[in-house]
């Protein structure tokens, strides 16, 4: 493979991975701006509707150290296709469901695959370039994380308020389906080259710095999600602003993030 061809392949890979991370984060974070709409659509209280965010986040927290480990020896393309397929199917079901319990299930199942896809996206980006360029490659993928918060939340809020909750779920489905097809047809097979034993991988859990990092991430995200999840309901209840204004405020908040 020539250098120019390899560079084109890497650019395409980075684009697909970045868009994939955006789709995954968009599915996770997009609903935080439409909690009141979910409550109204499914006839539940706002705190109950908040479980669409809390349940997703809790499952990620507990599955993140385990699920990537279980799939660490499987072809990376296969794993990404599996994760994206779960997201597409779950999002598609959420488009049509009128049952709140079913909605929670469609939120819970893909949450297990969230850390799986995101971890592979970051590691694949880093390993696809030289060691010197790895930080730059990872930063590109992280743009998908930022976009999920900066664009995903306000866009979802706007779509749900102007059309319907189902329309917002269609948005989730289309983004993830596009990435799924791009992954299937444009990304080559990526077998795992270095297969570490599960014991070797688990040994990292003995490092205090890891648990300190876990705690810091837990506290930061708990504060952010706690504020972010109920911001729209607070603004509607206290200030009586429209969802168009809320979408703009969510965009500003996402930019600050």
What are these regions (language model features)?
Residues 29, 57-65, 149-150, 254-257:
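Residue-level signature of mid-helix packing/kink "hotspots" within the transmembrane helices
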Residues 90, 101-109:
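Paired small-residue
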Residues 62-98:
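Conserved MFS/SLC helix-loop-helix module at the cytosolic interface between two early adjacent transmembrane helices
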Residues 102, 131, 139-185, 230, ...:
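Helix-loop-helix hairpin linking two adjacent transmembrane segments in secondary transporters
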Residues 211-250:
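Extracytoplasmic gate region of multi-pass secondary transporters
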Residues 13-46, 64-67, 228-232:
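Extracytoplasmic
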Residues 106-144:
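Cytoplasmic helix-loop-helix junction between adjacent transmembrane helices
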